[in-house]
């Protein structure tokens, strides 16, 4: 079902180009489209009236600009409407529960009110997100091997949706909580490693769910959710060892409205690059399904090396926490590699066609490259404001340029030379390694203007 329906989707999209002109864009909107638009406008108006005193001019402009963007997204992909409604309702409920009878917010109620303590305070929601992403990954993988695989994959997909919703609720409530700590502490939750890992998790999952819906196949979820679960694993370790969930004031360099645009754009790029790499890995697994020679199974061994040697990278921090966490991480990583190795034939049967994997890989890289380009330009403008120059060859800037050049070359070869298949897949995997170093490795091993803390 996965391969046939997804391939038909590609063919249908190709055929649509030759059809005649239909009704105009707004003429195609129905009553539910317009109702969603009205609700978005009403919500933004309420937010402006309620919180405009705490906003500067740039933040007000962002709020106004977010209205047409949100309406368009809801019209473009209808499942986002339900997601937006659930996130808004849960976030407003949390804000209401924080209020005392005197009408003043009290963050101590997070330990006193049942719903806040166990479900929708920022930390509770993010912990639920973490558990549900793990469960989603497990169900997707069970779907690879079980006879009733479609049912397990459906459960994995639904759990991923709930996890995305809880991640957004946690982020929204954390934003509110930061403002209640102090007027100078409140900030959009994209300012430190903890917050951006939450951002990475839900953005990556949301983009994958879009591709899953568009191509009508859940066969890619097992691989994409692996990278989300890996990020969640790091997030939990970082939370426990570094107490990173605590809300801290921004360092001066981050007290800029450019951050509100630069960081989300950057992580759309990171998330979609990660999707492309995991689909490239799936492509190589499908390609080597019937291979028995060990040296031809290089993609599997590559995954094993990357996963199993990650504890060595964090060996200093692992020692601080007793090493037990990374020992478990090593064991789970080895189990995953072994499962893929011995079950590759069954996995290949459940994966979509090579054409679908290649097409989604290309589209994910194209989207990521567009947003990463925007983020790089915004970062240059931010640097000019913070440090007086658009470019200083700081290690972070240099590696961002390397990432940009890598994917620019990939897209150039795709569009000009028809790059596809094995070479494209390996290149996408290498691209993820480069991107990961640019994101984490630079902060760990190099120093520069972007070093705002240590792991």
For every predicted segment, state its role:
Residues 2-111, 119-247, 254, 261-350, ...:
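Hydrophobic cores of alpha-helical transmembrane segments in multi-pass integral membrane proteins
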